Amino acid sequence: MGSALIQGAINAKILQPSTVFGYDKIIAASESFAAATGASICSSLEELSQSCDTFLLATKPYDVAAVLKNLAASRGDRPALVISIAAGITLASLESYLPKSIRVIRTMPNTPALVGKGASAFAVGERATADDANAAEKLLSSVGLALQVPEKLLDAVTGLSGSGPAYGFLIIEALADAGVRHGLPRQDAIRLAAQTMLGAATMVLETSLHPAQLKDMVTSPGGTTIEGLAALEKNGVRHALIEAVSAATHRSIELSKI
């Protein structure tokens, strides 16, 4: 995900490869990052901390403390900005490892950022400035939609857009299975289902109409669509999706307390 965000920023001309430096304790991961972005690779966290003033923290949650403590020791009192995509790590936790000279922003991107169609949200820490928020928005906007929200809403963001791609994949798979059931070749069914969901989403974003209005526009009295919708309602699909988002949101809250 970190590579996707950096590559998006480079493609959008927000960053130049010559200004990007990276480090990963796994050498192969560092090499892959360099190949994807054209960035320079540092041999240690200490070297990285001396090379940049803005840091994208794209590590596993269990590595966050060690990485930030190292950064704090290496930077001293020199100002810096940390933008974290580490799942479940709160702003308070991030800030607790850092001196007051280092500002923090917490983000929740999703996997469609890998193809430039992400939906991300971010929250700013107590020491972050308006310029910091603008920098985070530019970075996240380079790979899709970016919204600033209060941190208390990031768990809901996780349940909705963070986990949402998996719900979408399941829906596409189910639609394709239904097409296969009625005679469509598998690959054709998948492409039709995926393009249909893409088209529906694009209509919502580009028309600014409520999804219910768009649904009504394609639902003729006594037609095929209303029969399909009635079957969805009868089988609780709407409720199942609401419960899926709620379950993922509650799990995100639990993980942030571990």
Show where each model-derived region lies.
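Internal alpha-helical scaffold of NAD(P)-dependent oxidoreductase catalytic cores
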Residues: S93-R103, A119-V157, F169-E206, R251
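Hydrophobic packing residues within well-ordered alpha-helices of enzyme cores
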Residues: L5, A9, S30-A34, V67-L71, ...
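NAD(P)-dependent Rossmann-like dehydrogenase/reductase catalytic/cofactor-binding core
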Residues: A194-I258
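Short pre-catalytic strand/loop immediately N-terminal to key active-site residues, enriched for Gly-Thr
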Residues: I105, L154-G159, P211-D216
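Small-residue helix-packing motif on alpha-helices
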Residues: V20, S30, L48, V64, ...
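NAD(P)+-binding Rossmann beta1-loop-alpha1 motif at the extreme N-terminus of oxidoreductases
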Residues: M1-Q50, K117-G118, V180-H182
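Rossmann-like NAD(P)(H) cofactor-binding subdomain of soluble oxidoreductases
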Residues: F21, T37, L45-F122
